[in-house]
């Protein structure tokens, strides 16, 4: 029997519904239950793939090629359960599906309305592919009271009634702010937020209250009284030093016990939180510190690189060091001598991105890492910049560039619209809906024997990683570039697409066409990030 937990948020945005959902999933897993997490986003975009990183933050790509909300990254990192395209639905996608059905005549001439047609489609999205699971946790994006959220709230209200209280639970995340002038925590915002939920017919069974200090017992009982929940169901969510401490903090506050009590399940035994305690201990008590310069385009909003920042932290956990990130706008390196800012860093990372702006600075950062023997990791666009730098400065091809920036004399990076996926040829068209010409999702790569990257992957001959890009390194320049010293150490199974490059005579220099950060977890750091930080530790001891 599958049980559903619906997580909503109120008062203000950015309270951490994604972390709360992921933490509850981790706690239920620690008690032996199977879980799946889903996110419903109330915006009209079909998916976040075409949204500006400054508007939305990172686009998290799943194995099956879905471009999804960054919260799905939290779900995967906390639970280890790989998300799919079924785990993220937007208003745009729901409306597109309903309109397509109406055009096909599926509704038999009925007047198509928000209720029941849109709400039914939302319920179908929630219930899809859940057989055999113990728990499905569904996060509703946005803030209660927003007009955009109303169809989703109505859908989960209906679903709560249809499933019944033994199979459905409503959890509401709110803010209990501290007012310095009054010297006390204020419960009124939470009361009003719950009132908004009641206006749409939802009575929450539990409140998670974000606060920066403990909630006095009297205030906790006051919240319970006015919001019509048990005092034990008012769960304080205190600020902690690292997000990986949240599952422990929530358990100590009674979150998982109260959820199990609601469903009539055993809740007295202690969950196994050993791996979370070990992670927190390592983060709190590192044996050293390394500085990594992240030379990117969207550094003004760090959510644009959410998975990347977490993956670097995971690399630090694997090596028992703190990773200090120096976020650098690549455009500054287009000024003469500015690249000297990288003196003293222990590693340089150039992440993914799109467009020509800032590419000159990224190429300068690549050159600095190559010439100074500083550990380097280039991801997606970062690998392409490494190839262009090698072509211009080592292979005698000063006109080398990418066709992404316009026509060029030496297109060492270009657009491909078809490639092999398994035994089939996959084609993308610019007018298509799913990313257009984007190469999305998990693809295999073969690693060259004796290469650094093969050693990093534990001598694996074949790997599978997630991609999100339109442009590819041109295989026709392989011989020229390898003669100049840049080794093509990973290729697509058909040998036509360069996936990994490295310098054999460099202490640690790897560029990858895929996004390894999307598969890294705190309890299972990705080998590339563990290896990169290990190389940075060695660099730290040299300088």
From Swiss-Prot:
GO terms for molecular function: ATP binding; CTP synthase activity; glutaminase activity; identical protein binding; metal ion binding. It comes from the Bacteria. Residues 1-265 are annotated as: Amidoligase domain. UTP binds at residues 13, 186-191, 222. InterPro entries: Class_I_gatase-like, CTP_synthase, CTP_synthase_N, GATASE, GATase1_CTP_Synthase, P-loop_NTPase. It is an enzyme of class 6 (ligase). The active site is at 380 (nucleophile), 515, 517. It catalyses: UTP + L-glutamine + ATP + H2O = CTP + L-glutamate + ADP + phosphate + 2 H(+); L-glutamine + H2O = L-glutamate + NH4(+); UTP + NH4(+) + ATP = CTP + ADP + phosphate + 2 H(+). Pfam families: CTP_synth_N, GATase. GO terms for biological process: 'de novo' CTP biosynthetic process; pyrimidine nucleobase biosynthetic process. Allosterically activated by GTP, when glutamine is the substrate; GTP has no effect on the reaction when ammonia is the substrate. The allosteric effector GTP functions by stabilizing the protein conformation that binds the tetrahedral intermediate(s) formed during glutamine hydrolysis. Inhibited by the product CTP, via allosteric rather than competitive inhibition. NCBIfam families: PRK05380.1, PyrG. Homotetramer. Catalyzes the ATP-dependent amination of UTP to CTP with either L-glutamine or ammonia as the source of nitrogen. Regulates intracellular CTP levels through interactions with the four ribonucleotide triphosphates. Belongs to the CTP synthase family. This is CTP synthase. The gene is pyrG.
